[in-house]
Amino acid sequence: MGEKNNSKPNLGYGFYKAAAVTFPIALGDVFENAKRIVKHIKRAAEENIQLLVFPELCLTGYTCGDMFLRKEFYEQAEYALRDIKAATNGNTVLVCIGMPVEDHGKLFNCAVYLQSGSIKGVVPKTYVPNYGEFYEKRWFVSSTCRTAETIKLLGCTVPFSEKLLLKGENDVVIATEICEDLWVDSPPSGLLSRAGATLIVNPSASNDVIGKRDYRRNLVKMQSGRCRAGYVYASSGAGESSTDLVFSGHCMVAENGKILAESKDIMEDEAMVVGVIDIERCVNDRRKYNSDVWVNVPDIVESQIFVSGFPHVLPDYVEPYPFVPKNAAERKNRCAEILNLQARGLMQRIRATGIENVVIGISGGLDSTLALLVCCLAFDKLGLPREQIHTITMPGFGTTKKTKSLADELMEHLDTTYKSVDIKAACEQHMKDIGHAFDVYDITYENIQARERTQILFDYANMINGLVIGTGDLSELALGWCTYNGDHMSNYAVNVGVPKTLVKYLVDAYADIYADDIGTRSTKGVLKDIVDLPISPELLPTDENGEMVQKTEESIGKYDLHDFFLYHYLRNGFGREKILALAAIAFPNVEVSEIEKTLDTFYWRFRTQQFKRSCIPDGVKIGSVALSPRGDLRLPSDLMKMY
């Protein structure tokens, strides 16, 4: 049943631990600044940080003014660099510091990379600002003024280019842009990422004015997303001159459009912001979203780095519910948006067909409830009466009084046209016709009921000229947890893009957002009761007390886990071993053996049930994970192994 890969597992997982540092600058005192930098290098080594980024011109201070015109000043900075270089001996932390570097009579504002006692490369700033409060052109020239791709620093000839790529193992490729480079219309990181950079470093000295922090955060977030890369941003703070400006020491670590870690809003004298960047995810996204026109980036300069401790890096926290926003306000807004997407899809189908009746089977469970609420929302927006929503309960051998009662209440309170059709007699007759024993509770026993219900819905829809609305969700479709040509089939499937872990929040949100449209307080109570029910298809007989016996998660494992697996398998393209490692962090209270067993189930069912997905009805996509064979997922139904 398991889909384990027999090859040796990759224990690297593609994570890279990076930190951005701000510290109190001793303005103009290069040796004191070197001391403070060394202190952070030692700390980074102790904390197994692989990349440590300091602010722009941190060795001297950014606001030294005409001191940058003094040859002795930048010569002393180079001399102080010796202490920093020595501090990188005996560890493998890749260190990026900002300092002035002179070459052929020109002064460049540079990022200098050091690792294991050697200088790996020097990157000069390209866009040198000279407006408002910035006068950098008074002292520095652009990278376009360099005359060679190497430079002498501390007696060594090292790479010197704004197009420097620092290359390591496991797809770690580091490029650099410095402060203003990010703020222009075409940041260097865009081109460098197309040349292969997977992580962008930005040593910065960005002063603060009202609103600038939010703008800066958005720049970093969006650029990391546009480049599909990690982004480490470190800005100067305390110690810079306050003659005219204030620097807050804004530090961020971002990945692929998301801020992983950030310094506090209040100004901190000292901060080390640490984030674990998923390089593999960035590379997988580039492979998937490959609409970029390939261009040859000329004059790329490469330098090799050692990616230290890569196999041992894992994040401390992993979000267990990737489909569900943690923040309550954000979650409510997201749910409102999803409900509208679902409703809009159905509205278009109604307009296009001219069919203004819908038929939906109501079980009293979450999925059919959500589908019904979407129908109500669509009909309200179209100005159609809810009486044209035809809701049918079809009690069978496993239907409980509780779910039947909730279904009846819901249909009545939502002003739909409702009726009940008991399927037990029809199913018994069918079992008799095909020679199936009444007391053998196998897959045939279950599917007979599911297909009987589907037959009723389609025949009734023919009778009233209506559309059958599908209720199955994204998670069920991924696992094939539906009866082929039973609940698998409909005229339009409104829940097909919604993962199971999100369904209850959508029902809950409808109850809150559209409370006035629902009618009575009791309807809201019914919805809350439905949210609390265990998940079950109710296809097996109830116990002697009429209680539910069949519970889906006891058969296939927790949907919390399945949705986690689904997200990371499809959205991020991760392999089995990495998904297992992340799940163990995300669900610390679940035994690893249970996680592994459920993951085996996921892999097996996802592969073997593709034949159901190959012929699914139309339904709207609502998120980045979708399973339509006409869109996001193209797989053969007879795949022998899944990776």
Regions found by a protein language model. Give the residues of each.
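Enzyme catalytic cores with a strong preference for nitrogen-chemistry domains
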Residues: 1-361, 372-373, 377-388, 418
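ATP/NTP-dependent adenylation/nucleotidyl-transfer catalytic domains that generate, transfer
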Residues: 16-17, 33, 170, 227-229, ...
